[in-house]
Amino acid sequence: MEIKGFTYGWDSRKGMLGTEKANESIKAMAAMGGNWAALAFAVTQEKFSSTRFGFDYRRTDTDREIETAIKQLKESGLKVCLKPILNCEDGTWRANITFPEREFPVYDEHGRLKSYWNEWFSCYTAFICHYAEIAEYTGCEMLCIGCEMIGTEHKEEFWRELIRQVREIYHGPLVYNANHGKEENVKWFDALDYIGTSAYYPVEKEGGASADEMTAAWEYHKKGLKKIADKFGKKIIFMEIGCRSARGCAAMPWDFVHREFPRDEDEQANFYESALRAMWDEPYFAGFFWWDWETNLMPDEKIKDDIGFGIHSKKAEKVLTEWYSKK
C-alpha cells in the first residue's frame, strides 16, 4: 500500500499546532505503522456567497505553527500532504460555495464590471498558492488543492489555471479531494497526479452490520471508483474516510450531527476492517487518509464516552495498526 495515512490537525486553532503536546499526539499516530499524514487546517470566508477571504488573526493556524507541525510529522517518519481547506464561518458546507452563472451587471467603485467568479477564484488561487509555497520549501511530499468544493467544480477553466499557477510554485504531486459519489463532476482530474475523494460510502442500512457484511457492501462502490480511475488513468486516494464510534454511523459515515446514537466501538472497527479489506490490493488504489486524528490526544477518561471519529484507544486503532504494520 503506497499511502498508509491519517488526517491530522483539523481540530486545531491558533496556538495548538507545533506544541510539545501536539507532538505527543503525532508520535502516537505514527506508532500505528503508517507512513503519511494529511495536515489539514481551515481558512474561512464569511458565508457561501462571499468572494473574499483571508487570514483570521484570532484563530487561523499561523505559518510558523504549520511549518513546525510539518517538521514534527517528518521527524516521526511521516510524509506530509499539506491540505489547506476553505470553510464558511456561518456553518454552510463549503460544497455550497457558488455564484450565479448569468450575472446582472455589477460595477466596482472604479466603474469596472465585476465578476463574482473571477473575484472568488482570484482569492482562492492566491490562498492555495500561498500554501503551495510553504509545501515547497518545507518539502511536503504532496499538496491538496481543494476539498469538497462541489459548487465550483464545473468551472473547469478556473481550476486548470489554478493548477497551472500552483505547479510553477510547488513541484510535488497534486491532488483534489472530491466528494463521494460526485467524482464524475470533476472533468479536470487529468491535470492532477491523483484522484482524491472523501470516501464516506454507506456500507449498511442500519447499525450492527458485521465486518463481512460491510466488506460485501463495498463491492458496489468499487465499481464506480474503478471506472473513474480507468477514465483518467490515475490512482485514487481516499483523502478522507472514517466512521464515528456510534451505532448506525456506517450507514452514514459522514455524519457528525446525530449525537444521540449509542456508543459502539464495534461499528467503527468493522467499518475500518471492511474498507481495508476491500481496497488494500486494488491496483487502481493508492491509499488512505483516515478522518481524523486529534491535534492533542483526548484524555483517557473522556475516550470511554466518546462517539467521535477519533480512534485513539478504541478498537479501530488496533484494526488499523494490524493493517498498517504489514510490510
Annotated model-derived regions:
Residues 35-51, 64-152, 293-296:
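Substrate-binding cleft and catalytic face of glycoside hydrolase catalytic domains
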Residues 199-212, 228-269, 291-307:
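Active-site clefts of carbohydrate-active enzymes
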Residues 253, 267-274, 278-327:
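Aromatic-rich peripheral "rim/lid" segments of glycoside hydrolase catalytic domains that contact
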Residues 128-147, 178-218, 235, 243:
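Aromatic- and acid-rich polysaccharide-binding/catalytic face
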